[in-house]
């Protein structure tokens, strides 16, 4: 059986990237919360 994590930067960005976050209202809430917390990296 194959391992479950087969990394791909493109696929990862499509789900967790900045533009993916900004595309939905809830994603924007995520970015806003991470900004408020002072995270250096806002998204993948």
Swiss-Prot record:
One Pfam family of this chain: Ribosomal_L34
Domain of life: Bacteria
Gene3D superfamilies: 1.10.287.3980
Family in the record: Belongs to the bacterial ribosomal protein bL34 family.
Ubl conjugation among keywords: no
A GO cellular component entry from the record: ribonucleoprotein complex
Name this polypeptide is given: Large ribosomal subunit protein bL34
GO terms of biological process kind: translation
Source organism per UniProt: Mycoplasma mycoides subsp. mycoides SC (strain CCUG 32753 / NCTC 10114 / PG1)
Keyword set, alphabetical order: Ribonucleoprotein, Ribosomal protein
One Gene Ontology term of the molecular function aspect: structural constituent of ribosome
Entry keyword Metal-binding: no
